[in-house]
Amino acid sequence: MVERKKWSENFSEWFNEVIEEAGILDKRYPVKGMNVWLPYGLKIMKNIEKFIHEEMERTDHQEVLFPALIPETEFQKEAEHIAGFEGEVFWVTHAGHEPLDVRLVLRPTSETAMYSMFALWIRSHADLPFKVYQIVNVYRYETKHTRPLIRVREISRFFEAHTAHADFEDAERQIKEDLEIFDNLMKKLAIAYVISKRPEWDKFPGAYYSLGAEVVMPDGRTLQIGTMHNYKQNFAKAYNILYEKEDGTHDYVHQTTFGMSERLLAAVIAIHGDDRGMVLPPTIAPIQVVIVPIPKKGSEEEVYSYAREIEEELKLAGIRVHLDLRDKRPGWKFYDWELKGVPVRIEVGPRDAAEKTVVLARRDKLEKITVSREELVDKVRELFDDIMQYLYERAKEWLESHIKRVDTIEEAKELFNDRRGIVEIPWCGEEECGLKMEEELEAKMLGIPYPEESARVEGKKCPVCGREAKFIARFARTY
């Protein structure tokens, strides 16, 4: 039976234990907020990134790789941007013993690194749309409590796509494409999420508007796992990114960005997990099937031989399989592979070897079935599909049950006291009222549902000022 008691009641402790014991990260590195990726964790992350690369290829983004250091002179060009980031950047002030004439910033994000180069590369309307991406390390001096994968000082798997367009309409089309890419990726991870348009006071520094994608974690807090920003011409004007139009005149480009990080893995671990550990979607599991031989005395040769045959058959079928021949008891191995979230376990004993059958145990529901050797590959593939569907449906049900709509501050407070995730409240649209609600609820406004039409509301009053509400606003306690 699947238990999620510790997972929900003591999520922080559960998460830290799983990260460590399942071999995802080692957080004992001697710089706070910087962690060491372990082989198993890195393999999962690389499998997630494989889907990102595929989506980038499909949508004609080109991969680039920019330096990690940005001169202070470039960093300062967009005033709103630097004001938003100045307090959380790492500065390089010396080279050897000598102070630098121009200080360098370890990139917190790459707008200021990339856009001086965009100004050199983009010349004409024929160069547009211009679409690039990279997956790099970025650095932010987080002063809050750091937490592996969730809040770190070195985001080591930071995906950022940067695009330039001839006009606002084409930039808007890009945002729609980003949302489609994100949705495709979330389907591969079996994750349900919401998209919100950030309030003016919480949009990305330098953006015209920002969108954020959130999931609800087991403790009721939300985790931002993706962002899309439309910059209009704000950065293009600061970095002089001009192009020649078809009529021979010049104009500034319109720009967008799209970002994700290892928080994707944090969401997978948190949302699909249970008290036994991780439950990985087969799409990204480094090991999709683990074979555990269970020989009795005198039957070792037959059982191991049969297990190797099964391993070979699954490998030939393109399934990522591992045969566990460690000198440990079967129960210990079951515990270990359940902790690591391997989607399907195959148990092979003397009777299975004799009767040409196998026992399949699925990690998500902790259920077992016996199947014949002939139907093994088909059955395993069928199980993968079933697991993906079950994980997504469970994640969707979890998310939907943690979004509640109320009319008053008092009702919202009660829900937050009960750790109920996202609370939706009518809002007049005025910043003063939004900030007042944040203060009263001790929660953050995620924004309004996106697309904006779905956020409009009629016949409701703003609980702060009593005026007619224009939107539904989402609030949450966040990471």
From Swiss-Prot:
Principal EC category: ligase
Question: What compartments host this protein?
Answer: Cytoplasm
Q: Name one GO biological process term.
A: prolyl-tRNA aminoacylation
Q: Identify the keywords attached in UniProt to this record, alphabetized.
A: Aminoacyl-tRNA synthetase, ATP-binding, Cytoplasm, Ligase, Nucleotide-binding, Protein biosynthesis
This entry's Enzyme Commission designation comes to 6.1.1.15
Pfam assignment, any one = ProRS-C_1
Q: Spell out the GO cellular component terms annotated for this protein, sorted alphabetically and separated by semicolons.
A: aminoacyl-tRNA synthetase multienzyme complex; cytoplasm
Record-level Gene Ontology MF annotations:
ATP binding; proline-tRNA ligase activity
Family according to the record? Belongs to the class-II aminoacyl-tRNA synthetase family. ProS type 3 subfamily.
User: What note about domains is in the entry?
Assistant: Consists of three domains: the N-terminal catalytic domain, the anticodon-binding domain and the C-terminal extension.
This protein is called Proline--tRNA ligase
**Species name:** Pyrococcus furiosus (strain ATCC 43587 / DSM 3638 / JCM 8422 / Vc1)
